[in-house]
Amino acid sequence: MHVISKSALPPFWAKHPASKGPLEAWYKLVKAGLYKDFSDLRRTFASADYVAPYTVFDVAGNNCRIIAVIHYNRQRLYIREVLTHPDYDRWSKLYRSGKI
């Protein structure tokens, strides 16, 4: 799968150095994968959630979240946000209230 906006990862791990290894491992797995749909993706990323239209990945032992949009037919994953768990909680609250 082609990952768009990988450039969002280094600034995050610069602020949160412990996340660098897990984020790099996540990137390698996604890049190497060919996923036909969300169910197929969950075989590799069991903790991924679909929050329409986003796919949310738990990374680094639930310490950070990657919010992405995936076009399975084009094999493209667009990183929209890389957040800490508390920042994701705030994002989720805004999402549920329709502000995102």
Residue spans of the language-model regions?
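Basic, Lys/Arg-enriched alpha-helical interface segments
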Residues: 1-63, 71-76, 85-100
